[in-house]
Amino acid sequence: MHPPAAGRPETIDETAAIVTARGGRGIAVRVDHTEPEQVASLFERVGELDILVNDIWGGDDLIEWGKRLWETKLEDGLLLVDRALKTHIITSHYGLPRLRTGGLVVEVTDGDGFYYRGHFFYDLVKTTVIRMAFALSQELKDRGITAVAVTPGFLRSEWMLDHFGVTEANWRDAVERVPEFIASETPLLLGRCVAALAADPLVASKNGRVFASWDLADEYGVDDADGTRPHFVRWLAANMPEVAAGMKRADDGLYAYWGEMPYRTPG
């Protein structure tokens, strides 16, 4: 079994308790999602599904920012593919047969476009996850199941708070060093956006596409834990326009090139 990514102190039991505290029923199950047998066993226990969210990452300690492919540690790059892409494939393989008609598949990525993300393996994983949602939308449409990809903005995760040496209580102290952190969001915002997608009777109209938390929050009227509604790209456009200009989101022009092959391959 792989060790916990980046040695994080948080536990699955704590996560389950948070789910229960918010009105759900959190059930902690220890599973290594790189191991097909463990994932298969998990879904045998679960039974039927209404929604499947693939959000496994585990790459914070594997990215060598500023280095090109041939300069990176190959073993770290391949491990990142195992953790952040292979896990999604394995989980979908065993989970998708259990989705009910009208169900929803959500792939969580970083960014809602196909611009270069600054590192070969990071870019490979995050753009492939978007494409996975599209491919699944094609394979699931005859079952009445919708597949989308979603991205948070500047995520104020536990790892990021530790990285900047702050907590959720005083996170604004990091803004002087990292101005764009003022537009950050907690993981709760994207979770609320996913819940809104799952409750939308017209969610099938979004099939196969990628959506950002800031756009979904505006569309569904969703706020973050503190009642604010962060809009990362809007902040960038106002304060770092040269950065925002390079973050072109996937639009109708791009999707016009995506579609099912007009023929079937032999066999």
Cite the ranges covered by each PLM segment.
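Catalytic loop of short-chain dehydrogenase/reductase
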Residues: G58-L62, R68-L80, G102-D142, T151-T167
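Short-chain dehydrogenase/reductase
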Residues: M1-E48, W57-R68, R249, W258-G267
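C-terminal helical subdomain
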Residues: A149, A169-G267
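A short C-terminal helix-loop "cap" of Rossmann-like NAD(P)-dependent dehydrogenase/epimerase domains
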Residues: D13-A17, A21-G24, F164-P179
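A short, exposed helix-loop element centered on a Lys and neighboring polar residues
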Residues: I89-H93, F134
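Active-site loop of short-chain dehydrogenase/reductase
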Residues: G24-R25, E48-L49, R98-G111, D142-T146
